[in-house]
């Protein structure tokens, strides 16, 4: 769900009388997403208060609020399969961008602080890190007794990568020269 360059450019250039940007940390574990939905409900309330304080049209406020409430709660019975599927597949954070006639979400691999901003354009600065920095790294762990290649992603434990013909220890990796501890 990380936005593509064209999506990012559309967000960057979008303007409206009232654009709502919401960021919230989320959990990958399905049992904990109920807490995330509660946070979204609170952020929705804050967004509505900011929209009303900014003098937004009542219909625009209702449109934005309806989309946010539906995302947090699902349909009237609370069992919309698409919403349940959405919450079952989260990343580290969720970015939501809403304005009259527009609503989009992006699941992000980096952890962001909960916030709401209402302006004449979307607040995308927190989103930029997700599209700017790589979220994986390779580590060559070299010791006297072992050599390992590890892949580290944005979440979860490092994973050892098996490489054929990788030296077995520091002595082999140094070209059979003396290795001091």
Where are these regions (language model features)?
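Non-catalytic, solvent-exposed interaction/assembly segments
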Residues: 1-130
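Conserved nucleotide-binding/hydrolysis micro-motifs of P-loop NTPases
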Residues: 27-29, 102-103, 146-147, 156-157, ...
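Short helix/loop capping segments that flank catalytic or ligand/cofactor-binding pockets
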Residues: 31-32, 105-107, 148-151, 159-161
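Short, solvent-exposed amphipathic alpha-helical segments in soluble enzyme
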Residues: 38-39, 112-113, 154-158, 166
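Noncatalytic linker/hinge segments flanking ATPase motor cores
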Residues: 61-66, 134-141, 180-181
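Long, charge-dense
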Residues: 120, 125, 158-181
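Gly/Thr-rich phosphate-binding beta-strand-loop-beta motif of the actin/hexokinase/Hsp70
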Residues: 133-158
């Amino acid at each position: 769900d990380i936005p593509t360059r064209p999506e990012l450019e559309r967000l960057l250039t979008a303007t409206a009388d009232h654009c709502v940007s919401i960021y919230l940390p989320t959990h990958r574990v399905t049992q904990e997403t109920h807490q995330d939905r509660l946070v979204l409900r609170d952020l929705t309330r804050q967004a509505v208060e900011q929209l009303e304080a900014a003098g937004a049209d009542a219909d625009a406020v209702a449109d934005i609020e309806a989309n946010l409430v539906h995302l947090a709660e699902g349909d009237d019975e609370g069992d919309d399969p698409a919403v349940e599927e959405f919450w079952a597949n989260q990343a580290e954070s969720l970015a939501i961008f809403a304005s009259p006639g527009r609503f989009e979400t992006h699941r992000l691999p980096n952890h962001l602080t909960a916030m709401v901003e209402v302006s004449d354009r979307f607040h995308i600065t927190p989103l930029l890190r997700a599209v700017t920095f790589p979220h994986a790294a390779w580590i060559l762990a070299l010791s006297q007794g072992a050599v390992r290649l590890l892949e580290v992603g944005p979440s979860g434990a490092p994973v050892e990568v098996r490489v054929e013909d990788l030296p077995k220890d520091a002595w082999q990796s140094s070209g059979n020269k003396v290795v001091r501890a």
